[in-house]
Amino acid sequence: MAYHYPPVQSAGIERTRHFLRYLPDFGYSAQVLTTSAFGGREDEGVLRAWEPLAAYRWLFNKEARGGRAPSTNRTRPGLLRRLGRLCLVPDLQVTWIPFAFWRALRALVRGKTDLIYSSYPPASAHLLGLLLKRQTDLPWVADFRDSWIYDPLDPELQESPYRWALETRLEEAVLRSADAIVVATEAVAEHLRLTYPKAAERIYVITNGFEPGDFPRSDPPPVGDPLRIAHTGSFSISHSQRTPQPLFLALKDMLADDPSWAQRLHFDLVGALSEEEQRAAQGLVEAGLLHLEGPQERAEAIAYQQRAHALLLVDHARPWVSSNVPGKFYEYLAAERPVLALGSEGMVQRMVRELQAGVFARADDPVAIRKTIEELYDCFCRGELAVRRDPHFLKPYHRRELTRSLAQVFDHLVQS
């Protein structure tokens, strides 16, 4: 069960797409159950279940109309959305469950199935998995990827005690019933093991990763050029809490103190920016320090990474220790460029430190961001930014190797 699936355009589908690509290498063929809300052809390997709220999202969500995965978050939600988030728990996709459930049951009756697998987000996919587990007693793998309750993708969850309490009970039901729980970071695993000790032995970490063929090795630009830093992808359009605004403030402060930074530093932002982000960036664009490229095909976005000396990663700051790592981080590892990571204390900071992947600053602190950029520039001037990673270091993050780990979880359940 993978709600987000092509033709949807989303970084989140890459994990599922590559699992499906490589599972046959390890003896598994899969049939996908997804939504019909975004169109797409139904064929032998893909079932698409109708959902009543598809029309609602098409009317009120520009990303859905454009074939992109709808953002899980919104700032300043309208009345309809606020009402929907109060009544439709755990998410708007809950109306997909009854139709997907019957579609799945028909498929299970017609063919031999060894196990079922559900992919979060949305959390409704896990509720669908829970229903199918109770109906069929087949082994069930629930892939949480990121945290549902502790470090939620949806900021509105923290603002509703009613939803928080209800969804905590739903998470508990999933953890109690799933035969295996897969997560994408050690921090998520540690939290779930502490919260649900009876499930501890059923929790497995399978990180996100990259496809090595997408990242041919390349040398960075010459040191004599300006320090070029690239970011590929969007900010608040895909995750409302992620914002480049503190970065922009830091850069404006640097320019105000020393206009020569416009010749020494250059940022390429390759991806969709909101109107608010574009307005905030305008002065930096006019100064020549910032270039807004807009959305690009994947190959061209990777080319921008390879033309850069360093790569920008932006996560949002939290008042607690973060548990999630943006999937972009692993692609940046493959690009073999140091990472300028902006986030909060937690998993991103931990990964940058443990893998010696680059430098880190808190995402909501323009002063710290400025200091970190200046330190990065000093390293650049000394010729100390070059990164060459041992291929064996990167191999555990290859998509095929990660699929091997998932297949081993499947093997354990099927054989037992």
Label each residue range with its predicted role.
Residues 102-105, 124-127, 131-135, 149, ...:
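Membrane-proximal helix-turn-helix segments that form the acceptor-binding/catalytic region
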Residues 172-202, 349:
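A short, active-site helix/loop in glycosyltransferases that binds the activated sugar's phosphate group
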Residues 364-368, 381-412:
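A charged, aromatic-enriched C-terminal amphipathic alpha-helix characteristic of glycosyltransferases
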Residues 258-271, 276-302:
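Nucleotide-activated donor-binding/catalytic signature segment of Leloir-type glycosyltransferases, i.e.
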